[in-house]
C-alpha cells in the first residue's frame, strides 16, 4: 500500500516522517487483524481472553491513528485547539511536585516508545496525556494516578511540525 499522497502545508521531512509512521502502523494493524481473527472462537484461560481484548483495543487505537495520519497527509496539519488528546510527536515540558523538570515526548501507540527512553515518553491516551490536552504553558494540571490525584505544571508545549 504505497500510495503517493499530496499534502498541503507539510514540509517534506514532516511528510516523510508521517508517511513512514503510517506505513509502520498499517503493518502493525495488518498483523493485529490476523491475531484478532485467530482469537475468535478461541478457548483459553482468563489471561488469553485479556490478551485478546487488549489486541482488539489496540486495533481500534491503531485505526484511529491511521485515519488521523492519513487525513493529516491529505489536508495538512490542523491547529491544535485543545482536542481530547495531544497529537503524537508533541513535546511537553513539565514540572513535577518535587521540583523535577522533565521534557516528555507524546506518542500515540505504546510500540512507538524508544528503547531506553521509557521515562521520557508519554502516551496520548494515558491519564497524564489526556489531562494535558487543552492546557497552555503555565497551567497546573491535575491527573489521576493509582495513588490518587497528582499535579504537574505545564511549562512548554511544542507541537509536531
Curated annotation (Swiss-Prot):
Parts forming coiled coils: none
GO MF entry, a single one: RNA polymerase binding
InterPro entries to which the protein is assigned, alphabetical: GreA/GreB_C_sf, Tscrpt_elong_fac_GreA/B_C, Tscrpt_elong_fac_GreA/B_fam
Domain of life: Bacteria
Pfam families named among the record's database cross-references: GreA_GreB
Protein name per Swiss-Prot or TrEMBL: Uncharacterized protein Mb3817
Biological process according to GO: DNA-templated transcription elongation; regulation of DNA-templated transcription elongation
Organism: Mycobacterium bovis (strain ATCC BAA-935 / AF2122/97)
